[in-house]
């Protein structure tokens, strides 16, 4: 049987058979972890402060997902992280950006927004150091390792000091520089591969001595 998707996932007995979208939908699913006794108001307060008018959003007991055009998805995730940041609270955000999944659908998205991201002003005033580890999965291409090397060099060019750790790459820098890099990686992937997943973890104010 001919496989007509980027990952060879077109078998009719699979749960996502018949799905897929040609729309310009990117998404990020993430969970926020403030290591503080007031974690509930930190999480809910950040969700409330963040302007999600440019994306489709949904939260459940495990995570939050934003879906829409890539610049606005990144704007919403960065806005939430900035809104949740507190100078003395250790906090992590774990998530994944993705586009091109053969199991995706046309629904649950917002693609009509134009102009600057609604959280741009909030983001512009934020500056604090962030540690990040990431793992990139370019799907549906045989030269995936070359694509991973490309984004490594992008991190070098951005001054984020990439280093290899087991099963991931680690970078560090100002919050805006880190999110600009994640955005650039996603943009590069959507232009060069049919499907990608970028898994990342952000950490601030870690008590771990290095």
Regions found by a protein language model. Name each.
Residues 2-210:
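Charge-rich, low-complexity N-terminal segments
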